UniProtKB/Swiss-Prot annotation:
The gene is pyrD. GO terms for cellular component: cytoplasm. Belongs to the dihydroorotate dehydrogenase family. Type 1 subfamily. It comes from Bacillus cytotoxicus (strain DSM 22905 / CIP 110041 / 391-98 / NVH 391-98). This is Dihydroorotate dehydrogenase B (NAD(+)), catalytic subunit. CDD domains: DHOD_1B_like. Its EC number is 1.3.1.14. SUPFAM superfamilies: FMN-linked oxidoreductases (SSF51395). Heterotetramer of 2 PyrK and 2 PyrD type B subunits. One of its GO terms (molecular function) is dihydroorotate dehydrogenase (NAD+) activity.
Amino acid sequence: MNRLQVELPGLSLKNPIIPASGCFGFGREYAQFYDLNVLGSIMIKATTEQPRYGNPTPRVAETPGGMLNAIGLQNPGLEKVMGSELPWLEQFDLPIIANVAGSQVEDYVAVAKKISKAPNVHALELNISCPNVKTGGIAFGTNPEIAADLTKRVKEVSEVPVYVKLSPNVTNIVEIAKAIENAGADGLTMINTLLGMRLDLKTAKPILANRTGGLSGPAIKPVAIRMVHEVSQVVDIPIIGMGGIESAEDVIEFFYAGASAVAVGTANFVDPLVCPTIIEELPSLLDELGFGHISECQGRSWKQVCQSR
């Protein structure tokens, strides 16, 4: 029995560890360090219909416990992704999750309709929560009605299950999650980065050319855990949790909160071997905690409370 096997809509994962979109490119660089077949899946970099060159530099700033980024969805565009990147990934026995982005609803629909036809794309991740672009992105993820409408429109054209990436930069994430579920989403991924800023001590000006950027890394893990904990209790669709994961212990904590799988982001920049290391360490941690299968951890924090009432 594979103790780490996870079954999600459109995704049969040998383990629940997935490199997060934007922190793994299309896998080429990391394939130099290890066999990507050990992963559960890969969330490829956000894809837009036309190539995007991203925001001006500087686009990255270190922070205590993480980093700020304002990349701005730089990517080679749908044609290049489907003509080069996805075919390259076919050599691996991995279900690919394609991250879809755009400036308006029609952009998402156009990309989703085409990229969902790729033979190795098993699910879509709608990026409605990027805080680093002036149009689209987070604008779709902070309003329940708009988020639901976009989800519904994409579901109508997609040939694979649709997961929606939630923004933490909202007052009530539960309301948005429910609206997206009711619109037909097959799953949720959460959370995206928190909007932040750093100032230069000598100039008093923002370090990032974009002024603000998305905060990621261990600093946001408590926020991510809290939000997964809240949302998982009110939706009936699976959650892929993310935000500051860098160890097997972090993975279990997200499962306790209610996640069914996890995505590892910023930690890949610090240690390119972090994903295979976590996968290797998970079975012994399950032994230590007395679990036979990773699924036994799912929602344990709140399910125990419900059972004791």
